[in-house]
């Protein structure tokens, strides 16, 4: 097929690494948008960081919803490529883009209209709440750019061309890095300046994707961006992407509750610690997500082509790679938590509280990487429901655990321990689940249910 890479032949280690590195770098770039905002806004003080941190849960939720079409693209297009069906690959690509636009407009409108009651959930001081509402309304108008770019990224990943999203996202990051200090301090816009800078960068990424697909690439032989939705393709996309989007969205709802609890226990410092710590933790998350996405795309093609031995070897290789990095992140967070947190929020009370969070959370980093790597295996073979079941169940266990630990007198640290314990459980359970079903689900690798 035109414009794609065949992942069913050739050296597995090199293909996985070459595919994972740009995806991982792209994930880091997407993470860097938030970290760049956080680092500059951190110079305004912990209250400003708390304001954008409260919105950060909602932008995370938005990114989670966009996974419906990112994962939907990666798996549906990837399996169509593996099955040598270019017509299906083109149709899936068009359907994913169309669905992404519809969902993003609806979701962005809801956030814009209900920004005030949503932000007031956190019970922050009035001036912090006002800043957060303005920030959210600006960000919400740019959600179509985020959703469509996620769908474009999924299509390129499925085609084995993960370098393209990397370079495009990198361009957006550079623009955001330049605009952040200009808008925040130069124009004196404060937290709103960070929102405007991010909006412009995300719009630029979207426009570059459009130019790349329309004027430079003939990916899949060319396909229309928008199409009349057909039940066959729409149902398959939702079957693949909805469990992933649901588990990540519900995860964000859980974190919204934990954020409120952190705010009650530690006021704006507690909320700031949890949201900023989560952004820093994304170092591990995005690394494992990069390998997981590469593994998913690799397995999708090889599973559809009946290459079971390549599926298993790719799984073993990815576990080894992510295990090394997970161990490194554990050591970094446990022993250098204060120093890492101070890079983003140099206020002493903030980085001391953040250091405690990173130390506790650091114990679970290896297991987080294990969980996300295993998600890539399940997604690649088209079984997105098991990871959703495990993730949703364990994530919701954080709420009663956090309440229990707080009532035991552990304070805000009880919330951190609830997060750590459930993360360990998710990794171990998902690995065990796949080991149990591995023989059965790979016995007829060419079977792809619609």
Give the ranges of each region predicted by the language model.
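Short alpha-helical transmembrane segments in multi-pass integral membrane proteins
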Residues: 1-23, 77-144, 186-242, 299-364, ...
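Transmembrane helical elements of multi-pass membrane transporters/channels
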Residues: 18-37, 138, 149, 172, ...
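Membrane-helix interface/capping residues of multi-pass secondary transporters
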Residues: 38, 46-49, 86, 115, ...
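Small-residue hotspots at the loop-to-helix junctions and early N-terminal turns
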Residues: 46-57, 136, 195, 268-283, ...
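Small-residue-rich hydrophobic transmembrane alpha-helices
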Residues: 49-109, 146-165, 259, 273-331, ...
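Short runs within selected transmembrane alpha-helices of multi-pass transporters and secretion channels
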Residues: 70, 74, 139-157, 165-176, ...
């Amino acid at each position: 097929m035109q414009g794609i890479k065949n992942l069913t032949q050739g050296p597995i280690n090199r293909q996985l690494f070459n595919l994972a590195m740009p995806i991982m770098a792209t994930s880091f770039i997407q993470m860097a948008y938030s970290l760049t905002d956080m680092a500059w806004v951190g110079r305004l003080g912990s209250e400003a960081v708390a304001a954008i941190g409260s919105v950060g849960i909602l932008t995370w939720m938005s990114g989670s919803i966009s996974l419906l079409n990112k994962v939907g693209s990666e798996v549906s297009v990837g399996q169509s490529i593996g099955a040598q069906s270019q017509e299906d690959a083109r149709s899936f690509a068009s359907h994913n883009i169309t669905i992404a636009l519809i969902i993003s407009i609806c979701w962005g409108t809801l956030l814009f209209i209900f920004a005030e009651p949503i932000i007031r959930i956190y019970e922050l001081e009035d001036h912090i709440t006002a800043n957060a509402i303005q920030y959210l309304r600006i960000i919400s108008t740019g959600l179509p750019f985020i959703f469509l770019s996620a769908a474009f990224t999924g299509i390129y990943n499925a085609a084995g061309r993960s370098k393209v999203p990397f370079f495009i996202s990198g361009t957006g990051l550079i623009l955001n890095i330049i605009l952040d200090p200009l808008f925040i301090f130069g124009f004196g816009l404060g937290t709103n300046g960070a929102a405007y800078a991010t909006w412009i960068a995300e719009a630029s990424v979207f426009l570059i994707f459009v130019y790349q697909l329309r004027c430079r690439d003939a990916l899949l032989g060319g396909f229309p961006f928008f199409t009349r939705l057909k039940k066959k393709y729409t149902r398959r996309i939702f079957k693949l992407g909805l469990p992933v989007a649901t588990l990540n969205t519900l995860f964000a709802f859980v974190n919204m509750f934990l954020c409120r609890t952190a705010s009650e226990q530690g006021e704006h410092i507690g909320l700031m610690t949890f949201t900023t710590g989560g952004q820093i933790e994304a170092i591990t998350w995005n690394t494992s997500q990069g390998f997981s996405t590469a593994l998913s795309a690799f397995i999708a093609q090889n599973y559809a082509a009946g290459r079971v031995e390549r599926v298993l070897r790719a799984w073993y290789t990815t576990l080894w790679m992510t295990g090394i990095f997970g161990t490194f992140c554990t050591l970094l967070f446990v022993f250098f938590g204060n120093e890492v947190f101070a890079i983003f929020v140099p206020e002493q009370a903030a980085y001391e509280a953040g250091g405690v969070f990173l130390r506790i959370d650091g114990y679970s980093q290896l297991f987080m990487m294990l969980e996300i790597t295993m998600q890539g295996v399940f997604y690649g073979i088209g079984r997105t429901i098991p990871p959703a079941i495990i993730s949703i169940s364990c994530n919701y266990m954080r709420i009663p655990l956090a309440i229990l630990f707080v009532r035991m007198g552990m304070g805000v640290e009880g919330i951190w321990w609830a997060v750590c314990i459930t993360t360990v459980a998710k990794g171990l359970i998902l690995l065990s689940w796949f080991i149990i079903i591995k023989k059965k689900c790979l016995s007829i690798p060419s079977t792809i249910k619609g």
